[in-house]
């Protein structure tokens, strides 16, 4: 670095802009650029290390959020469709994700699952999925929950074909809610009827 400074001092300084440009060009083309290579590598490292850390931290955060979302989806499948045929469990997972994609519902799986809306008849907030108002416990080591977790992952990562395209609602076959009259029936799977 000291050699570079001495060479700069040795230069005769031109008095015009054109002279400055010619001097700089000739200096650049005739000098050894290995010193600049070191500075370039150092500068690149200074930029890449923080960028790499930022990417790793964001990836870890996204991975943690994905796990949380998958857990909420699995719990919803477990509570809403446990005991249903596999097609019914996949359909419940699809409805949950269809709601996330819809502008009429919250933007994350956990927010959709635990959403509460005001019910004029009951004069209180009620859960979109009935199990969220009841006992929320589940056996994470049970085969039913393991199946729900597997289904959640497959539907979340779009590894299966949709069964109930665009369905946003469903109810059990043994009830007849008034809102169902205004919806378009998409499918009947197991003990659930699905609507757009």
Set out the residue ranges of the language-model regions:
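Bacterial extracytoplasmic/cell-wall-associated proteins, especially those involved in peptidoglycan
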Residues: 2-40, 50-196
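Single-pass alpha-helical transmembrane signal-anchor segments in small membrane proteins across taxa
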Residues: 46-48
């Amino acid at each position: 670095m000291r050699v570079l400074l001495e060479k700069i001092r040795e230069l005769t300084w031109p008095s015009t802009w054109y002279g400055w440009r010619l001097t700089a060009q000739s200096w650049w083309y005739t000098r050894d650029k290995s010193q600049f290579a070191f500075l370039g590598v150092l500068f690149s490292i200074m930029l890449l290390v923080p960028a790499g850390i930022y990417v790793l931290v964001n990836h870890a955060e996204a991975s943690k959020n994905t796990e949380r979302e998958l857990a909420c989806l699995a719990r919803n499948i477990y509570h809403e469709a446990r005991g249903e045929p596999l097609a019914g469990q996949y359909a419940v997972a699809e409805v949950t994700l269809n709601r996330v994609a819809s502008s009429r519902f919250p933007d994350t799986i956990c927010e959709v699952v635990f959403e509460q809306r005001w019910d004029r008849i009951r004069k209180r907030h009620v859960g979109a999925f009935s199990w969220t108002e009841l006992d929320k416990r589940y056996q994470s080591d049970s085969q039913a929950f393991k199946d729900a977790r597997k289904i959640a992952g497959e539907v979340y990562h779009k590894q299966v074909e949709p069964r109930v395209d665009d369905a946003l609602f469903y109810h059990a076959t043994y009830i007849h809610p008034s809102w169902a009259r205004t919806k378009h029936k998409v499918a009947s799977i197991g003990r659930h009827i699905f609507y757009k």
